[in-house]
A protein has these predicted regions:
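N-terminal small-residue-enriched
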Residues: 1-504
Length: 504
């Protein structure tokens, strides 16, 4: 899609150059080896409905600036909300003071991997309709209409609906001379239907599979997702789910839809290949990683069919950017190739620690008040160029389960032992779907699971999934991230009955 949008004038009208000159000049005067400044404005809105009636509309805006320095080999950071040159000078001085105090306990001298200088460059994400330019009433009307379609169906007792959209505007400048201006928009619509068995008091739910996307309001009104088909199908699928038999625990061949597999990629590959986890720098929030650096180039992560890439360039990706929060341009690289671990996600400091020639652009802060940390790229399983369709993959399974949609999961602090559930499950008998199942969870270790992958679907099965709210760091930060993948088959995976397990 040709890029026709630009960064909003209201953001460009902020005193970006004056703040830059004040902060960076003062940092250099104080002897910093490196300094950078970020000015950010982040707008969020969430519209929530219950049973097709408005429940809440929440709006938020976060505007501020942050100064980060390297002084005598130590990080310093300070942030504020007053956009004046005097405040920028004060923040530079405060960041240097933080670095001076921290130097006494810093055992690893901070050095940044080199990056070309990008002078006065601009990037805007691919979207057509800015949701923040539409009246709330117009957005609520469409969400109400979609909700009413579900609520009118037999057996649907309640419908919970929401749509969250975000506009992120970011200016970055550093002492090397880079100056970047960026704007990106993302959206996450969600519709959940619920049915209640009044005789037993039990209930079941099912929600739309549409993933969050780096798109605008056109995601709900255009052709990139078939909302009409999905909303029409959910009530009948939900009725089938309520009558489905409980799964018999055992080992099955699994055919996993992209709507479920993206989350397994996120937890068992995405987080496991963040270099700060692999080095032990990140541990408190969800652990370190079994994929340690001594295994790079030798760890058999999965079958030879496993090809996983990281990127910050995929169109409509949630982690897609022009430049990261250290001024590094978006790139694509291999993480797992032919089943072997070959790469990590890194920022400039981690790249230098490992002797890499360059960062692959994985620094991100979720607000102007937070320091950038190493965050996840779009981490994706590549399809087989001439690979089979989903129906063809199912057709090759004698006894198995087809897994659709994400739900709950758990994974250990090394990103190794895990289990995942889903939205719906279908029994496969002699290559055909034979009705839904309930109470299914699949369980494995990361390398056993990916090692059991025997078929990878073609490009026609590929879907870009993802999440708005990947958590990391302390104080906690959230980041949006996409994971593309095709349908894939996994042989003889352990399946648990969740009801039986809960009663143990």
């Amino acid at each position: 899609m040709p890029q026709t949008r630009s960064v909003d004038e209201s953001f460009l009208a902020l005193p970006l150059s004056a703040l830059t000159d004040a902060a960076l000049t003062r940092a250099l005067d104080l002897g910093c080896e490196h300094a950078d400044i970020r000015v950010e404005r982040i707008r969020t809105q969430t519209i929530s409905l219950r049973d097709a009636r408005p429940e809440a509309v929440t709006d938020g805006e976060d505007l501020g600036l942050a100064v980060r320095v390297v002084h005598e080999g130590t990080w310093g950071f300070a942030a504020g909300v007053v956009l004046t040159a005097a405040e920028a000078v004060r923040l530079a001085e405060e960041a240097v003071a933080v670095a001076t105090v921290s130097a006494a306990i810093n055992s690893d001298r901070v050095e940044l991997a080199p990056e070309p200088v990008y002078r006065d460059v601009t990037w805007v994400s691919e979207y057509e309709t800015d949701p923040f330019e539409l009246p709330d009433a117009e957005k609520t009307t469409l969400l109400t209409e979609f909700s009413e379609r579900l609520l009118a169906a037999d057996g649907v007792e309640h419908v919970q609906s929401s749509c969250m959209h975000v506009k992120e505007q970011k200016y970055y400048a550093d002492t090397a001379g880079t100056r970047t201006r960026q704007q990106r928009v993302r959206i996450h619509p969600d519709f959940t239907a619920l049915t209640v068995d009044r005789a037993t008091g039990s209930f079941e739910s099912m929600r739309t599979l549409a993933p969050p996307a780096g798109r605008g309001w056109e995601y709900l009104t255009g052709s990139s997702w078939d909302w009409g088909r999905e909303l029409a199908e959910i009530p009948e699928l939900l009725r089938e789910k309520t009558k489905a038999p409980s799964v018999e625990a055992g080992r099955y061949d699994l055919v996993i839809d992209p709507s479920n597999l993206w989350l397994t990629i996120h937890e068992s590959i995405g987080h496991a290949t963040e270099l700060d986890r692999a080095l032990g720098y990140e541990a408190a929030y969800a652990g370190t990683s079994f994929a340690t650096v001594d295994k790079l180039g030798t760890l058999q992560y999965g079958s030879p069919l496993l090809h996983v890439t990281g990127d910050r360039t995929t169109p409509n990706g949630l982690s897609t950017i022009g430049w990261d929060d250290e001024g590094v341009a978006g790139q694509e690289w291999d993480i797992v190739k032919d089943g072997v671990l070959v790469g990590y996600q890194v920022d400039r400091n981690m790249a230098r620690l490992r002797g890499l020639p360059r960062s692959n652009g994985c620094a991100f802060a979720d607000s102007p008040g937070h320091v950038p940390v190493q965050r996840m790229a779009n981490v994706s399983l590549r399809p087989t160029p001439d690979g089979p369709s989903t129906d063809e993959i199912i057709g090759g399974v004698e006894r198995g389960i087809y897994v659709v949609g994400d739900k709950s999961w758990s994974i250990d602090m090394q990103r190794y032992n895990f289990q995942f559930t889903g939205q719906r499950f279908y029994r496969i008998e002699d290559g055909k779907l034979a009705g839904q199942l309930r109470d299914v969870a699949y369980q494995a270790t990361t390398t056993d699971f990916w090692g059991s992958m025997s078929v990878v679907g073609g490009p026609q099965t590929y879907v870009l999934g993802g999440a708005f709210n990947c958590g990391k760091a302390q104080p906690g930060q959230t980041a949006p991230v996409s994971h593309g993948c095709p349908t894939a088959r996994f042989d003889q995976v352990s399946v648990l009955n969740t009801v039986q397990e809960a009663g143990r």
